[in-house]
UniProtKB/Swiss-Prot annotation:
It comes from Aspergillus fumigatus (strain ATCC MYA-4609 / CBS 101355 / FGSC A1100 / Af293) (Neosartorya fumigata). Residues 60-77 have a biased composition (Polar residues). The keyword Cell inner membrane does not apply. One of its GO terms (molecular function) is ATPase-coupled transmembrane transporter activity. Keywords: ATP-binding, Membrane, Mitochondrion, Mitochondrion inner membrane, Nucleotide-binding, Transit peptide, Translocase, Transmembrane, Transmembrane helix, Transport. ATP binds at residues 465, 489-500. The keyword Signal does not apply. Residues 81-94, 702-719 have a biased composition (Basic and acidic residues). Glutathione binds at residues 300-304, 363-366, 413. It is a multi-pass membrane protein. Performs an essential function in the generation of cytoplasmic iron-sulfur proteins by mediating the ATP-dependent export of Fe/S cluster precursors synthesized by nfs1 and other mitochondrial proteins. Hydrolyzes ATP. Binds glutathione and may function by transporting a glutathione-conjugated iron-sulfur compound. This is Iron-sulfur clusters transporter atm1, mitochondrial. Homodimer. Residues 153-175, 273, 380-394 are mitochondrial intermembrane.
């Protein structure tokens, strides 16, 4: 049995309990002590979590959290209008809302204009040269394509003789035309393939730049945005959007303009060679074909949007289920998750069927229009041959020219359909780039200078995730430089919010936060966040090796520095025992290692970063008592050695009783502040909480002593000799 001084005062309460595969901190004792001290119960008025989020599935409603983070239901639906940090009202990027035709066209043109910047960048002459070369090759290919029917006409007319009477061979009669015909077709194909090869790097470079810009923008967005988004659906939408970039660029350069050029050439040739009737039929066909295609495709757009939205929902359910695999298993909800996924698949199936059937209608209408035009032109040409005005070669040439149009026309129809699809897929991608970055640094922001050693001062700070539910209310306190500072209080009182405000995940609504007399809003974000190190309550780990996760604290750290950081966090010995050592994979979100190991990896990462300001948010809640005490001793030695300003957020008072200053929060206000001894002498909230935890510890010790006595007595009875048998 461990000595009483080393034991946790919370042993009677569960250290952690399973929730979604994560280890939750022990907050039950705080709630018990707090309710026992005060007659009126604490409500969750300060908590940003909505109580009425009952429209979510039952599994979600069973889970509770004490972390004051706005949920999607609250943060994105009712954001504060007057808070600089709050997310402004915005439409759901993954929704299936169908815009009016005028609005949709406006959105499409905005995307096309944006992509034109990547197609013809101002300062990239290499890209401009490639685009210009590709366009030249394209024009050459189209001209050669239009020349092919002329050679075919000449071949037919040349061969329309009586060889028995005239004599000669096919080579002597039409040899040059046949060679020209073959060379022209080969040249057109060669130009097209060269065009594709030249333009390939332009499209791929644009995809990379757009994807990089979107990803960079996502990382700049505030915490509230990421907490309210559906990761699975968002990643699926981004993936579709990036795939649509290549098609959009190719369509802009190689399909829309070239098809218009080819149609103009054919109409001009028909008018010049055969009269206005042929050109009129061609022009009318183009107008009818284009109008029918655009109208029908616009009608089909809503079906594609519904399919995309269902696809996003399915991806969201799948990703959430796999990430929270343990929660699904703990509550035997496999069939529930399968039913949710199948519901999204059914919606996608229904929308896809509508897409396919409407596509059949579109294709049928296009073929009817074109076939009618072809029949009309063939009649005119045949009538001209019958009247002696045209030759058989002219009939063949008209047929060839019309069929020459069929390829770009049919292709234009499919291109327009795919173009609309690409624009829809890219709409989410470009809407992401329009989401405002709420936390910005000033143009004249300067690097943070810690000339006083890292003194932190909150001056009349008021903040709430929602206007009607403030978390901090006119809070003022100072964290002296180089001291160990602790923040305690009930769940939802704003302890973790203090860290988020200091780190500038959010900005205060009133008051200001100073570090060495510098407002955090006046310094650069990079220097501010570089100076702060955090061990969060829920340790974020990447699906990579242990070494990578520790080195994430300082990317350029050597292996030796990584090992030293792990030693100081008392996890090196454990890592060395693993078969693959530091190259052991931790799994998705670190699920392959225990909660205590995750927290020690987080502390290793913090030690490696070596920042001036340290924050520990229940950093040892998942550790056993012995490891916790040993690790705290190491942390305290580091703090004393380097004289770092450190802040500990804790529920178990025995882990922070040696702090230089302890701040007690109540209802978002500073209730008490002082050293452990001063707060006990004050005989206020802190003293009552301490006594409640000590009483719990005493009860634990008495219970264990009674258990041990019972065990000893039981063993003695078992070993005592029984009554002698009668002789």
């Amino acid at each position: 049995m461990l000595p009483g001084a080393a034991r946790s005062p919370c042993l009677r309460f569960p250290r952690r309990f399973a929730h979604g595969g994560l280890a939750a901190p022990r907050t039950a004792l705080w709630a018990t002590a707090w309710y026992g001290i005060h007659s009126k119960a604490f409500t969750s008025a300060n908590s940003p979590l909505r109580k009425d989020a009952s429209k979510e599935p039952a599994l979600a409603s069973n889970s509770k959290t004490t972390n004051p983070i706005p949920t999607q239901a609250s943060a994105s639906v009712n954001p504060p209008k007057d808070a600089r940090n709050a997310t402004t009202a915005k439409k759901d990027l993954l929704s299936e809302t169908t815009l009016a035709n005028k609005e949709q066209r406006k959105a499409d043109w905005a995307i096309i204009k944006e992509m034109a910047k990547y197609l013809w960048p101002k300062d990239d002459w290499g890209t401009k040269l490639r685009v210009g070369t590709a366009l030249s090759l394209l024009v050459g290919a189209k001209i050669l394509n239009v020349e092919v029917p002329f050679y075919f006409k000449s071949i037919v007319d040349s061969m329309n003789i009586d060889f028995a009477t005239v004599g000669g061979t096919a080579y002597t009669v039409a040899g040059s035309m046949i060679i020209a015909y073959g060379v022209t077709r080969i040249g057109a194909t060669l130009f097209q393939e060269l065009r594709n090869a030249v333009f390939a790097s332009v499209a791929q470079k644009a995809i990379r730049r757009v994807a990089r810009n979107v990803f960079e923008h996502l990382l700049r967005l505030d915490l509230n945005f990421h907490l309210s988004r559906q990761t699975g659906g968002l990643t699926r939408a981004i993936d579709r959007g990036t795939k649509g970039i290549s098609f959009l660029l190719t369509s802009m350069v190689f399909h829309v303009v070239p098809t218009a050029l080819e149609i103009s050439l054919v109409c001009g040739i028909l008018t010049y060679q055969y009269g206005f009737q042929f050109a009129a039929i061609t022009a009318a066909t183009m107008v009818a074909y284009t109008a029918f295609t655009i109208t029908t495709t616009a009608w089909r757009t809503k079906f594609r949007k519904q399919a995309n939205a269902a696809d996003n929902r399915g991806a969201t359910v799948a990703v959430d289920s796999l990430i929270n695999y343990e929660a699904v298993k703990y509550f035997n909800n496999e069939q529930y998750q399968v039913a949710r996924y199948d519901k999204a698949l059914k919606a996608y199936e229904d929308a896809s069927i509508k897409v396919t059937t409407s596509l059949a209608f579109l294709n049928s209408g296009q073929n009817m229009i074109f076939s009618s035009a072809l029949a009309a032109m063939m009649y005119l040409a045949a009538n001209g041959v019958a009247n002696g005005n045209l030759t058989v070669g002219d009939l063949v040439m008209v047929n060839q020219l019309v069929f020459q149009l069929s390829v770009p026309l049919n292709f234009l129809g499919s291109v327009y359909r795919e173009l609309r699809q690409s624009l829809l897929d890219m709409e989410t991608l470009f809407n992401l780039q329009k989401v405002n970055v709420n936390i910005k640094e000033k143009p004249d922001a300067k690097p943070l200078q810690l000339h006083k050693g890292g003194e932190i001062r909150f001056e009349n700070v008021t903040f709430g995730y929602h206007p009607d539910r403030p978390i901090l209310k006119n809070a003022s306190f100072t964290i002296p430089a180089g001291q160990k500072f602790a923040i305690v209080g009930p769940s939802g009182c704003g302890k973790s919010t203090i860290l988020r405000l200091l780190f500038r995940f959010y900005d205060v609504q009133e008051g200001r936060i100073l570090i060495d007399d510098q407002d955090v809003r006046d310094v650069s974000l990079e220097s501010l966040r570089k100076a702060i190190g955090v061990v969060p309550q829920d340790t974020p780990l990447f699906n990579d090796t242990i070494a990578h996760n520790i080195r994430y604290g300082r990317i350029d750290a050597t292996d030796e520095e990584v090992h030293k950081a792990a030693q100081r966090a008392r996890i090196d010995a454990l890592i060395q025992k693993l078969p693959e050592g530091y190259q052991t994979a931790v799994g998705e979100r670190g699920m392959m290692i225990s909660g205590g190991e995750k927290q020690r990896l987080a502390i290793s990462r913090l030690i490696l970063k070596d920042p001036e300001l340290l924050f520990f948010d229940e950093a040892t809640s998942a550790l056993d008592t012995y490891t916790e005490q040993a690790l705290l001793q190491n942390i305290n030695s580091i703090l004393k050695e380097k004289k770092r300003t450190s802040v500990f957020v804790a529920h178990r008072l025995r882990t922070i009783y040696d702090s230089d200053q302890i701040l007690v929060l109540k209802d978002g206000r500073v209730a008490e502040m002082g050293s452990h001894r001063e707060l006990l002498d004050l005989n206020g909230i802190y003293a009552e909480l301490w006594n409640a935890q000590e009483m719990s510890l005493a009860q634990d010790l008495e219970f264990e002593r009674e258990t041990e006595r019972d065990d000893v007595e039981s063993k003695e009875r078992d070993m005592a000799p029984g009554p002698k048998a009668q002789q």
